[in-house]
A protein has these predicted regions:
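Conserved beta-loop-alpha segment that forms the PLP phosphate-binding cup at the N-terminus of a helix
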Residues: 38-64, 70-75
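Conserved active-site segment immediately N-terminal to the catalytic lysine
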Residues: 153-164
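PLP-dependent enzyme catalytic core of the Aspartate aminotransferase-like
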Residues: 303-333
Length: 333
């Protein structure tokens, strides 16, 4: 591979070569995922770290967390454990984002695609909540959406995602994207307690550097990925169409979808309900055929399985999995 042949992974992270990779990765994200040029792009170890960075870099701020699944709940828990005032608002998995009167806060925290249950907050809902609360900053966990579907950038201020989902890269890195408003607030507050505090990281990111030794391999792979993929507007629509086909096909074959409201179904994570015994046998049979079905998560751990609908998955792979599921379903009836 070119990255190894050029010796990039053995370079010092302050070297000109690695800085150039960082810069090209940033330029690629701006070009292919339409990240605004005035948003700052940083690299961290994980989405979980991004939860911590937010809470620690804006210590004392008040956070409203609106969620319906395990990852949104965990994020709220991190904000609270780190000492910030938190208003946690849980809503039903088959309902759209609640149109409630929100308590006062500095931040509104949303999960774009909730990986644990396969729900989705549509772009128009994110746009509306920003319009209703223009004075607040909006944080968006885009772990199961960045690189697969469009992000309403102008309505978000702190967007982050691990790279192993829609971006299809090895785990061990996350992309963190800050609006000018979020960056200004972080620098204004000037909290530098932690090595990864934004007040420490943002000035270095402007120079395509980090406060720590980053995952150089993933940065280089991200750079290459951005150079080779289509723009997000050419990825989003086919992925949405493939998701709709999955949901329609599963319903036609008698599978029980966890999310009954198609308006809030995730385009990237399809979640199916079944008995615990059925899922045990299904996953065993799938493994024998070379398929890996995702485990359930949280309260649905033993009674659901999840199907990834990421850009790297081909139509032939979808068809092969559907043929397997059809055969298994017929044998169980």
């Amino acid at each position: 591979m070119e990255i190894f042949a050029e010796g990039l992974t053995s370079r010092n992270h302050r070297s000109a070569e690695v800085i150039a990779c960082y810069r090209r990765a940033v330029e690629g994200l701006q070009k292919k995922l339409l990240v605004p040029a005035d948003y700052t792009i940083l690299f961290t170890s994980s989405a979980t770290e991004c939860w911590e960075i937010l809470a620690q870099s804006f210590a004392g701020d008040t956070f409203v967390h609106i969620f319906n699944g395990a990852f949104g709940a965990k994020w709220a828990g991190v904000s609270q454990k780190l000492g910030n005032p938190v208003h946690a608002i849980r809503y039903d998995i088959n309902a759209p984002l609640p149109d409630w009167q929100l308590p006062p806060s500095n931040w509104i925290c949303l999960t774009h695609c909730e990986t644990s249950n396969g729900t989705y907050v549509a772009d128009n809902q994110i746009i509306n909540i920003k319009k209703q609360h223009p004075e607040r900053l909006v944080a968006l966990d885009a772990t199961s959406s960045l690189g697969g579907i469009s992000i309403p950038w102008e309505s978000t201020d702190y967007v982050f995602a691990s790279v192993q989902k829609c971006l299809g890269l090895p785990s061990g890195m996350a992309v963190l994207i800050c609006s000018p408003q979020a960056a200004h607030r972080a620098m204004q507050q000037g909290i530098t307690t932690h090595y990864n505090s934004l007040a420490n990281s943002l000035p270095l990111a402007q120079q395509y550097q980090t406060t720590h030794t980053p995952n150089i391999l993933d940065i280089c792979l991200l750079m290459k990925l951005m150079e080779n993929i289509a723009p997000i507007y050419l990825i989003d629509k086919p992925l949405q169409q493939q998701a709709a086909q999955w949901y329609e096909w599963l319903a036609q074959q008698g599978f029980d979808l966890l999310i009954s409201n198609d308006a809030v179904r995730s385009p990237t994570v399809v979640t199916v309900k079944a008995t615990e015994d059925y899922i045990v046998h299904l996953k065993s049979a799938a493994a024998q055929q070379g398929f890996v079905l995702g485990n359930g998560y949280g309260e649905w751990k033993n009674t659901t399985f999840r199907i990834a609908n990421f850009p790297a998955i081909t139509a032939a792979e979808v068809m092969a999995l559907q043929e397997f599921l059809l055969t298994f379903q017929a044998a169980k009836q």
